[in-house]
Amino acid sequence: MFLHSVNLWNLAFYVFMVFLATLGLWDVFFGFEENKCSMSYMFEYPEYQKIELPKKLTKRYPAYELYLYGEGSYAEEHKILPLTGIPVLFLPGNAGSYKQVRSIGSIALRKAEDIDFKYHFDFFSVNFNEELVALYGGSLQKQTKFVHECIKAILKLYKGQEFAPTSVAIIGHSMGGLVARALLTLKNFKQDLINLLVTQATPHVAPVMPLDRFITEFYMNVNNYWILNARHINLTTLSVAGGFRDYQVRSGLTFLPKLSHYTSALSVVSSAVPKTWVSTDHLSIVWCKQLQLTTIRAFFDLIDADTKQITQKPKKKLSVLNHHFIRHPAKQFEENPSIISDLTGTSMWVPVKVSRWSYVAYNESDKIYFAFPLANHRKIYTHAYCQSTMLDTNSWIFGCINSTSMCRQGVDLSWKAELLPTIKSLTLRLQDYPSLSHIVVYVPSVHGSKFVVDCEFFKKEARSMQLPVTHLFSFGLSSRKVTLNTNGLYYNIELLNFGQIYQAFKVNVVSKCTGSKEEITSIYKLHIPWSYEDSLTIAQVPSSTDISLKLHVAQPENDSHVALLKMYTSSDCQYEVTIKTSFPQILGQVVRFHGGALPAYVVSSILLAYGGQLYSLLSTGYCLEYSTILDKEAKPYKVDPFVIMIKFLLGYKWFKELWDAVLLPELDAIVLTSQSMCFPLVSLILFLFGTCTAYWSGLLSSTSVQLLSSLWLALKRPAELPKDIKVMSPDLPVLTVVFLIVSWTTCGALAILLSYLYYVFKVVHLQASLTTFKNNQPVNPKHSRRSEKKSNHHKDSAVQSLRLCANDAEDSLRMHSTVINLLTWVVLLSMPSLIYWLKNLRYYFKLSPDPCKPLAFLLIPAIAILGNTHTVSVKSSKLLKTVSQFPLPLAVGVIAFGSSHLYRVPCFVIIPLVFHALCNFM
């Protein structure tokens, strides 16, 4: 039936939309670097010792447990409590296991062994029963309260110890990080119980999929508390995102709110973390060896030697985190580093007067100081740049104040350096150091190892170039190019007009080298100055290297910085940089940032088609095919202008006051604008994707009904069309009451699913009856739709008595097809709470709180009546004219209020369905 109404042009359009959506999905799920994380290994068998909690607590939280992680002899020793280390609590996230603590716990244990257990950490982990808290937010508050009790229980294990801790450090993965932040919102919680919070791939800004009001309210409470109490929160917090490999939680959601008066929070993407430099997926972030090593190094540097616990000094905490996660100078962390260093001993001093210098050190027996006098260089150049391939942690570059060619003391400039994968580098603006007479590079004595030191002086203008990015709608057909003609070591390319999340580019760097036959490495670093989301690309030159340019966080309105492509190059090579728009990556950004809103646009399109069918039934007496009416009615100009107009009017104070007076919720478009997520044409693109999805879902549901009806006819004797229409069949009240009882006593989503299956059964039965009727009737061309319209116009006696004919059955099936599509999305959006309930059935028979219960009490009776509804009874209703007007404003409402709050979408669906059901009685 559905296939007969397919228009080839429309079909081609929908196929094209599928192609575009596939490009975007491919970029999200496959368009990133390979997994470069090293696996972390346990050298001894991991053990999880269950911590006994008070019986009252276990009764209140029967599904939750607390464990202590250990290995080998450490695990054996600590089976006899109390403990003597530094407590760290790991909180797993959505569907996460308490055993995920083993990677970081094992690395911390090995580090403690290296220092003979001078300090060591005790890693605890909470078992949340792998609850799906990203899908159902009703248990988040319960988890938060349990963690509070766990912290108190952990600290009791250290009672009586000489250096007993008074607080714990928390590492939270995914939603576990949000639960940790929520601790501060508890009435009886003391903030001093947490000394450090590290979150990994935690969506702090908003839920990934707001599928129920509980998760949205939880986010609102947590974020509002942190914003309103920012001055009083002295908890040092680090949020680490996974980058583009993490398609479950996009990195933009992990950035903590930036408040001018709250400076104890850092947010960084793993690709920008020194000594990590890789993107991680949502699960590998807990076992990625590079990242866990960085985390543990920071933890050990945070220890206060006097208390043998994590320091209570906020300034030191931030210094340590900046050192390890933001900018690493290739030196061991020191709280108060000595700026002045002694340059003494029997070292050789060599003056260097050239502007470009390179030294290859191999089997050096003597220490050498290379001194670069600055007097002449200051007249010509603005900057000095040095790099070394020796990646040890010793000081290697100094500044002399003496005017002579050698000095006894120098300013240690090594703290200004930056560690990169293959080099450590330092760039100095000479005017910032007017008192320096020399720059001194120190080359230690080495045996058996080889490294290279390079230095050069340059003018900023010669090494800084501007490269305007190509236009969004160039679709990769045009490009812009810049050539690095000078043979320098370091270049800055300013990427002008690049600062929006919808922008995406492909950069190609071609290097051509002469002279050296040795393997040469170049580093290309994308630096985003308004957020720590840098990424590095290492290339062996000569080569042609592609780099993807796209953002996790848009540039703030008041930020004037420019994104940079920093190039650490070889003086033997020339480089050509080409940039062009990447259309597939733009589609990927649309899917990445707005894919979660697609169900709202799908339902909006179906509602428009539904309204068109009701109006067709009112005006012509028959119902159009779903695909035909979808093509006719699902137009973006029926929805978007209203949303844009409302958003515009909300900018006026009088309209905003009126809006608040009638208690309307905040417009979703305003929420997206506040998160810098609104960009041109995104609503149009999403509407087209939504209409395309509605079309293919309609095709799928229609095909499924026909297949099920064929199966029905194969298994059962042929059914007949009912001779009398009975909206209230004898079994209807019983089924309705049963489903309502199921909803009240177990789970609302379960009752909705059962009602949906009942409705599908009724439609399949009607389809089977119609098929049987057609197979048994001779083909008679006189009985056409036109003749039926004529008979309807003359109020034929069969219609007057509401006799159901084959054409009326076809009309009913067309209407049922649309209703099934609407109900399918309602069921899909309610499924998360059902899955959560099924998973926790052994602990709780009744889901509480239940986000779907109010919806179920309205939807179940409506579905029961609609299952027995035929168009012949609806089109004679006085209520039909009013009902046919509902879907259009509701389609607007779905986009206005449901695109960022998906749990509201079923509420807009249920209204026309209830009134449609009432048409049988009015």
UniProtKB/Swiss-Prot annotation:
Q: What is its EC number?
A: 3.1.-.-
One Gene Ontology BP term is: head development
Query: In what way does this protein cross or attach to the membrane?
Result: Multi-pass membrane protein
For this record, the Gene Ontology CC terms, alphabetical, are:
endoplasmic reticulum; endoplasmic reticulum membrane
**Which keywords has UniProt assigned to this entry?**
Endoplasmic reticulum, Glycoprotein, Hydrolase, Membrane, Protein transport, Transmembrane, Transmembrane helix, Transport
- Extract the InterPro entries matched here: AB_hydrolase_fold (IPR029058), PGAP1-ab_dom-like (IPR012908), PGAP1/BST1 (IPR039529), PGAP1_TMD (IPR056824)
Give the subcellular location. Endoplasmic reticulum membrane
What are the recorded GO MF terms, alphabetically? deacylase activity; hydrolase activity, acting on ester bonds
Known glycosylation sites? 363, 402, 558
Its domain of life reads Eukaryota
Q: Which residues lie on this side of the membrane: Cytoplasmic?
A: 1-11, 619-641, 690-694, 755-817, 916-922
Pfam families on file: PGAP1, PGAP1_2nd, PGAP1_3rd, PGAP1_TMD
Q: Which residues lie on this side of the membrane: Lumenal?
A: 33-597, 663-668, 716-733, 839-894
Enzyme class, broadest EC rank = hydrolase
Residue intervals passing through the bilayer: 12-32, 598-618, 642-662, 669-689, 695-715, 734-754, 818-838, 895-915
Here the segments flagged for biased composition (Basic residues) are: 782-793
- Disordered: annotated segments: 776-798
Active site residues of this protein:
174
Looking at the keywords, is Transmembrane present? Answer: yes
* Mutant phenotype after disruption: Homozygous knockout mice lacking Pgap1 show otocephaly and die right after birth. However, some survived with growth retardation. Homozygous male knockout mice show severely reduced fertility despite the capability of ejaculation.
Q: Does the keyword Cell membrane apply?
A: no
- Which family is it part of? Belongs to the GPI inositol-deacylase family.
Q: Quote the PANTHER family the UniProt record gives.
A: GPI INOSITOL-DEACYLASE (PTHR15495:SF7), NEGATIVE REGULATOR OF VESICLE FORMATION-RELATED (PTHR15495)
Chain's role: GPI inositol-deacylase that catalyzes the remove of the acyl chain linked to the 2-OH position of inositol ring from the GPI-anchored protein (GPI-AP) in the endoplasmic reticulum. Initiates the post-attachment remodeling phase of GPI-AP biogenesis and participates in endoplasmic reticulum (ER)-to-Golgi transport of GPI-anchored protein.
Q: What is the name attached to this protein's record?
A: GPI inositol-deacylase
Chain's gene name? Pgap1
